[in-house]
Structures are given as structure tokens and as C-alpha cells.
Amino acid sequence: MKLQIKPPNNFAEFVGKQEIINQIQLSIKASRINKAQLDHILLYGPPGVGKTTLARLIASEMNTKLQIIQGGHLQRPSDFLNAVSLIKKGDVLFVDEIHAVAPSVMELMFPVMDDFRVQVLIGKDFNSKMVEMKVNPFTWIGATTQFGKIINPLEDRFGMILNIDYYSNQEIERIVSIYGEQMELELKPEEITQITQHSKQTPRIAIRIVKRLFEQKIVNKKIDLAALFKSLMIYKNGLQSIDVQYLKALNGQYEPQGIKSICSMLGIDKSTVENKIEPFLLRENMIQKTKKGRIITRTGRNYLTSC
């Protein structure tokens, strides 16, 4: 029998974030009783913590369809109008990385979020006219890894704003245990702990390690976490090669470094540095942001010495 990772099918199977789950379930029940459309929801937090999974479970709980679109794909009014024209009453529209939606499209989004209608320009030049387009009522779920880029007029239109943050070690251990059982890995408690310690408190990374561990087992007939972490270039505390390169780049400087200098030293883009590398290093107090730029902390230097 082919073994594969099975994502949660309902809120009961979703590990962690119980207060957020309770709030969502309460709102769904209230909307049913009131026979009203569920309020729009904004989910924000780092990558890999379950924002898309929550959107899927919300749609499932509401017994409706989930439509998914990337914010970066909404760059022209026609992109948005095509998307909402396909929505049926009660559907859930999930816009991932909603901060990437073009400003011209956001102007159309606001009236749709308010009362499900939008003014559309039909025709050209002297023959053009504004026509009101009605949209079927739906629930809008936006997700972002860059909450600071969400403009106030957009933020104000969400009835629920939920922070999906990093997970506790206990929650990650539970996730590793569940998926390890699905893959019949028979993980020992110390192995679960090791995987947790190398997961950056992020479910997506933990699940990725479990998948690679399964591959290792079916090929080599045994589990060797040390060899796996080495092959994946995952270091202590879950830091990856690019994270260590970042720390080494700062460690070799005598003055704070600006984001442009760091990008130049690493050869990667600003968005990757700010959204994929720095959040966890800041959380672990390995780096600090100052007015003059980024600096490595004593914790960061000690990490480089030990890894």
C-alpha cells in the first residue's frame, strides 16, 4: 500500500492554535444561526504555519467550495473581475499573499468586500459608461506573510484578523508523531525531539523532514537523522545553509549592514532576506535590527562557533 501524508480533514485534526480554531468555529456557527455570510478573515504570520490549511478547513466546515488565487496574479482589474465572476453564493475566496495585489485592483476589491458590488467601465472613449456589477455573496480569506504591507482600508474590511504564529515545541512534536505514524516510521521519542528541534517551530518544515526520512527508510532500510540533516544541510535549531551564510556575512563585518549590502553579499533578493531568513533569526535573538542596519548578536556568534 502506498503511504502518503494526509492533511487534516477537519478542525479536530488540526494540531495547535486552539484559541484561533475556537474563534473561527464560533463565527461559523453564529453565521449559520443568523443565516448570514461569514465575515471576511485575514490570516497573517510566517510561511508554513497552516494559513492555507485553515482556509481549506473553513470552506469544508461551511460545506462550500474554496477558490484559491495568488495575490501576485491580481495585477489588472480584469484579473480580479474574472476571479469574482466565477464565485458562487457562499463560496470562500482565498487570496494568498494578499499584500501583493496591485493598488488598482484593491480599489475594486473594497466595494466588493463591503456589499458585493463593483462599478465597471464598459466600452471605450465617448461610448464608455459605468455599469454596476453584482457579485454573489462570499467569504474572503486573505493570507499574508507581510502584515505591515496591508494598507489600513484593506485591513479594516476584515471582520476577523488572526495571527498564525510559530508553533510550540509540544505542538510540533505532536505533528511529527502524527505524520510519522502515517508513514509507519515508528519514531522513538528522542527522534521526534530531534526532528522538532530542527523544524524552526514550523509545521511545513517538520512535515518535509518526515517525508525525507520516509524516503531514507525505504531506500536504506533504516533511519539515520544525523545523515539526513547533513544531506539536507539543516543545522542546529533548524537553521539552513542560507541562514548560516547570513550569520557569517554579518559576523565578518565591523559595522551594521543595510539590507542592500546583505543582499549583495548573499546574492539573493530583498524579499527572501526579509521574509524567509530574518524573522526566525530575530526571534531567536541571533541578529538585531538597528537604525544603522543589521548586527549579529552574541547569541548568533556563539551559534556559529558551535555549529
From Swiss-Prot:
One protein family per Pfam: RuvB_C
Disulfide-bonded cysteines: none
Keyword Magnesium: no
Positions of Mg(2+) binding: T52
Broad class of where this protein is predominantly found: cytoplasm
InterPro entries associated with the record: AAA+_ATPase, AAA_lid_4, DNA_helicase_Holl-junc_RuvB, P-loop_NTPase, RuvB-like_N, RuvB_C, WH-like_DNA-bd_sf, WH_DNA-bd_sf
Annotated SMART domains: AAA
Region feature (Small ATPAse domain (RuvB-S)): 168-233
Positions with a binding annotation for DNA: K289, R294
Region ranges (Head domain (RuvB-H)): 236-307
Any one Gene Ontology BP term: DNA recombination
A GO MF label: four-way junction DNA binding
Catalytic function, reaction form: ATP + H2O = ADP + phosphate + H(+)
DNA repair is among the record's keywords: yes
Key words of the record: ATP-binding, Cytoplasm, DNA damage, DNA recombination, DNA repair, DNA-binding, Hydrolase, Nucleotide-binding
Subunit architecture: Homohexamer. Forms an RuvA(8)-RuvB(12)-Holliday junction (HJ) complex. HJ DNA is sandwiched between 2 RuvA tetramers; dsDNA enters through RuvA and exits via RuvB. An RuvB hexamer assembles on each DNA strand where it exits the tetramer. Each RuvB hexamer is contacted by two RuvA subunits (via domain III) on 2 adjacent RuvB subunits; this complex drives branch migration. In the full resolvosome a probable DNA-RuvA(4)-RuvB(12)-RuvC(2) complex forms which resolves the HJ.
Protein role: The RuvA-RuvB-RuvC complex processes Holliday junction (HJ) DNA during genetic recombination and DNA repair, while the RuvA-RuvB complex plays an important role in the rescue of blocked DNA replication forks via replication fork reversal (RFR). RuvA specifically binds to HJ cruciform DNA, conferring on it an open structure. The RuvB hexamer acts as an ATP-dependent pump, pulling dsDNA into and through the RuvAB complex. RuvB forms 2 homohexamers on either side of HJ DNA bound by 1 or 2 RuvA tetramers; 4 subunits per hexamer contact DNA at a time.
Domain free text: Has 3 domains, the large (RuvB-L) and small ATPase (RuvB-S) domains and the C-terminal head (RuvB-H) domain. The head domain binds DNA, while the ATPase domains jointly bind ATP, ADP or are empty depending on the state of the subunit in the translocation cycle. During a single DNA translocation step the structure of each domain remains the same, but their relative positions change.
Family that this chain belongs to: Belongs to the RuvB family.
Name recorded for this polypeptide: Holliday junction branch migration complex subunit RuvB
Organism: Mycoplasma pneumoniae (strain ATCC 29342 / M129 / Subtype 1)
